[in-house]
UniProtKB/Swiss-Prot annotation:
It is found in: Cell membrane. One of its GO terms (biological process) is sodium ion export across plasma membrane. Catalyzes the decarboxylation of oxaloacetate coupled to Na(+) translocation. Keywords: Cell membrane, Ion transport, Membrane, Sodium, Sodium transport, Translocase, Transmembrane, Transmembrane helix, Transport. This is Oxaloacetate decarboxylase gamma chain. It is a single-pass membrane protein. GO terms for molecular function: decarboxylation-driven active transmembrane transporter activity; oxaloacetate decarboxylase activity; sodium ion transmembrane transporter activity. The gene is oadG. Heterotrimer of an alpha, a beta and a gamma subunit. Its EC number is 7.2.4.2. It is an enzyme of class 7 (translocase). Coiled coil: none annotated. It comes from Klebsiella pneumoniae. Pfam families: OAD_gamma.
């Protein structure tokens, strides 16, 4: 009976050591990736963003007045072709 308890204790010890090593490795990996990212950004900085062009002028509110004759002509043409 005591042999099983010792074996179970060694199993838990081995499990904790394994999880500890994996945790340490993953933390080191995270810091290494962050360090490489900082190094790359220092050596090869991104170029400054080009200024955005000014927005195009907004069409006047009475734009419908210019389009009204074209719309009427299109409706007339459609009705003439499809009575």
């Amino acid at each position: 009976m005591t042999d099983n308890a010792v074996l179970l204790g060694e199993g838990f010890t081995l499990m904790c050591l394994g999880m500890g090593f994996v945790l340490v490795f993953l933390l080191l990996l995270i810091f290494a990736i962050r360090g490489m990212s900082l190094a790359v950004n220092r050596l090869f900085p991104e170029p400054p963003a080009a200024p955005k062009p000014a927005p195009a002028a907004v069409a006047p509110a009475d734009d419908f007045a210019r389009l009204k004759p074209a719309i009427v002509a299109a409706i007339h043409h459609h009705r003439r072709l499809h009575p």
